[in-house]
């Protein structure tokens, strides 16, 4: 287990260095397979429950099997696996971009409910993934625009926010737990789709980069600069109301 944790730490460090390099140069990688591999590795890292869900469960005291039964993804929080596989490449990237906006808002709401290191690492992972999503969308559409090599700005999520907050702190904890479980499931599916791009290249006309360039696929908006999250000690407010301790 210690070796696996060390491996994840090294992978995270490598991905962070790649992100910093891209932002520093202001350019995206023009190599499709290299960029695709980075996206696959980032998705693999973000799907790991030990990066976010497990620290949340530990800190909130949700260890028991009975409570785990109620820590479930709510239908509609994230696009389904079937829906993701049906999307064209550009639509898939746009869906990832939109969903990352929801995840960033949720991370902001959970800032006081997660260990500081886990929260900062998760935020960095989402930003880096969003940066490479933009780079891939730019590569597929054949754009020469070098700007906006930045992570995604939080935008509209895939589903509306709940109209009313949960009736108790305990229910809010379970709701947040289910959201994080869904987040890891979503990233696992996203990684599978991205691996499918490499495995099926040359066989799928719909997912062909050349075809995407020829048909002038819909443009994914460049990612504007992301807002800085509120510092610890100044809670931004819960996604479903102010957290009650």
Swiss-Prot record:
Biased composition (Pro residues): 153-166
InterPro entries found in the cross-reference section: 4_helix_cytokine-like_core, Leukemia_IF/oncostatin, Leukemia_IF/oncostatin_CS, OSM
Post-translational modification: Propeptide processing is not important for receptor binding activity but may be important growth-inhibitory activity.
Keywords, comma-separated and alphabetical: Cleavage on pair of basic residues, Cytokine, Disulfide bond, Glycoprotein, Growth regulation, Secreted, Signal
Annotated GO biological process: immune response; oncostatin-M-mediated signaling pathway; positive regulation of biosynthetic process; regulation of cell communication; regulation of signaling
Propeptide: 207-245
Biased composition (Basic residues): 203-218
Residues of this chain annotated as glycosylated in UniProt: 97
SUPFAM superfamilies: 4-helical cytokines (SSF47266)
Function: Growth regulator. Inhibits the proliferation of a number of tumor cell lines. It regulates cytokine production, including IL-6, G-CSF and GM-CSF from endothelial cells. Uses both type I OSM receptor (heterodimers composed of LIFR and IL6ST) and type II OSM receptor (heterodimers composed of OSMR and IL6ST). Involved in the maturation of fetal hepatocytes, thereby promoting liver development and regeneration.
Protein name, UniProt field: Oncostatin-M
Record organism: Bos taurus
Gene responsible for this protein: OSM
